Amino acid sequence: MDLVVGRVVKAHGVTGELAVDVRTDDPEGRFVAGAVLRGRPARGGAEREFVIESVRSHGDRMLIRLQGVGDRDAADALRGTLFLVDSAELPPIEDPDEFYDHQLEGMAVSTTGGQPVGTVAEVLHTAAGELLAVRDPDGAEVLVPFVSAIVVSVSLADNAIEIDPPEGLLDL
């Protein structure tokens, strides 16, 4: 399964640097000089491999220079490109209470009382912590803080998450 680890937002400057939204918990390990990235263009087309020349932080994004991307026009052509990795390449997680986002997405969510809540559509990473965006069958979405006081259990084997929501959380 392909996982998105970054997305090209725009060109930065005139020398071909790219402003990239990072979507990995290991940016220092994944976005380093010499690393090879697999890119999928936003507007279709064939995937390509890119070699990183340099990386630097810029606010909440990274500025990345790729081999062969030497000016603003070449960088603009990559706008929207998704950088991907195969989930099989990810190292196993040793902590039983930690999960990769893709492991949680698609899981069924129910309360400790057995009431179905919905399915995890996305894991959101915020400054305050992680949130599970849970979508019900009608398409309504509720955000559930991914904290032990609310998320009682996660079963990869059963593809299920059990929550004990505080009063009113599911009514928002």
From Swiss-Prot:
GO MF assignments: ribosome binding
Domain PRC barrel: 96-169
GO biological process: ribosomal small subunit biogenesis; rRNA processing
GO cellular component: cytoplasm; ribosome
UniProt KW keywords: Chaperone, Cytoplasm, Ribosome biogenesis, rRNA processing
Superkingdom as given in the UniProt entry: Bacteria
Chief site of localization: cytoplasm
Localisation: Cytoplasm
Keyword Phosphoprotein: no
Family to which the UniProt record says this protein belongs: Belongs to the RimM family.
The protein's role, per its UniProt record: An accessory protein needed during the final step in the assembly of 30S ribosomal subunit, possibly for assembly of the head region. Essential for efficient processing of 16S rRNA. May be needed both before and after RbfA during the maturation of 16S rRNA. It has affinity for free ribosomal 30S subunits but not for 70S ribosomes.
Oligomeric and partner information: Binds ribosomal protein uS19.
HAMAP family noted in UniProt: Ribosome_mat_RimM
Entry remark concerning the domains of this protein: The PRC barrel domain binds ribosomal protein uS19.
Annotated protein name in UniProt: Ribosome maturation factor RimM
Gene name tied to this protein: rimM
